[in-house]
Amino acid sequence: LFNLDTKIILRISGLPKLNFIRKFFWRIVSKNIFLVTCASDETKIAITKLGIFSENKIITLCDPIINVSYFNKKKKVELDKNLQNKNYFLSIGRLTRQKNQQLLVNLFSILKKENKNFNLYIIGDGEKKIFLNNLIKKLNLSENVFLLGHKENVFPYIKSAKAIFSSSLWEDPGAVMIEAAFCNTLVISSDCMSGPKEFLENGKAGYLFENNNIKSLKNSLDKFFNENLDKKKEKKIFAKKNSKKYTIFSHYLALKKIIN
């Protein structure tokens, strides 16, 4: 099928739906593929088990998520004065089924009933906006949960948040989680496919909860509240270390090693 001198690298992010056409195409081109790169070890293991590509062709290659110079410039911007000194948690992502923000809205309904005075800021736009707005009103959370829409610069929000929630049903491994870790902000993430558990080292570098399980999410948040500052600092250090694997420079070095 291919008669080229160029080395062909197939990048796989997450676990794509393997319909007949995709399987058929992958099997045809598999012999001509130089490498298959996966964004996490979890995805690499899953792709290897399919038996379509030679195991020695499948590697993990961290995505180039962090542009350090851009990051350092953007994080210097001050947060809107109306939002400063607020006790808030943060969620960033498109308002879609995948991101599952309704789980967080329901969580903050529980917190309100417990008289815990915290806010949730949700940054992003998408097809679930009307649904989420209606849910916020239905649960009487208009003074607790706020849809802020799209923001060009999210870093001032990240660095000032108590923690970042990642409630996704699936990721690989999750750009916002990595950006938060680079900002030294703690992450509370769903244990979804593929990658959050790996990045957060099964809780060593953050907090994990069972995917789409509000009871488990509440337990993780309670753990966040109850852990001492030294333990939280330790988690931040491990997460920051892991986030450095996702800089553009780290990606360049890894690619250079692979290609050469």
Per-region residue spans from a language model:
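A conserved mid-protein helix/loop that constitutes part of the nucleotide-sugar donor-binding site
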Residues: 87-113, 120, 127-133, 175
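Acidic anion/phosphate-binding donor-loop and adjacent secondary structure
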Residues: 48-49, 64-82, 156
